[in-house]
Amino acid sequence: MCNSIILENKIFDSQWDNKNHTLFENLMPRDNNNLIENSNYDNNNINNNNNNNNTDNDNDNNNDNEPFYNSNIPNEMQINKYSRFGFKPSQPISKKNENQIEFNNILSFSIKSFLLLILYILFFNYQLYSKYFIILLSLNLIITLISIKSIFKYKNLKKLKNILIYKIQSKIIIL
């Protein structure tokens, strides 16, 4: 059994030596002098990185360890040196998305506060706290409407957050 495995390995090794490792050379050239003619690699991009103007990042130091940028490959396919797996970093959140996130946060806050008010009334006597319930419910609706309007009114979201915090604090004081 062991002899057959050794024999198979020797046969495999001899076949591998005869093929001259062409599989790996087709996938990735080992050095600059051994490039395949039909590949997308360009000798100028590898040997003359400092003189290349068709790069994604012009501020590169062009060290040997960093990936080179090939002008034949489209920008979407280029390897980004700052990412670990070759993907470009995620784009920053736009203002519309930021406003949408803030809008969703405000809506979730208003729904939660409304549910808390209902729980508050359920645990206590409804007749004693009916006036307070109506006042708190109206305050909740007013705060929600004002905060939704202020999203479209204020471009700076920090101002909006400060306004919301102030209104929440006033609501807690009333409670």
Curated annotation (Swiss-Prot):
Compositionally biased region (Low complexity): 35-56
Tree of life domain: Eukaryota
CC per GO annotation: membrane
Subcellular location(s) of the protein: Membrane
Principal subcellular localisation of the protein: membrane
Topology relative to the membrane: Multi-pass membrane protein
Transmembrane residue ranges: 106-126, 132-152
This protein's record includes keyword DNA-binding: no
Keyword entries, A-Z: Membrane, Transmembrane, Transmembrane helix
Renumbered residue ranges of the record's region Disordered: 35-70
Protein name, as recorded: Uncharacterized transmembrane protein DDB_G0291522
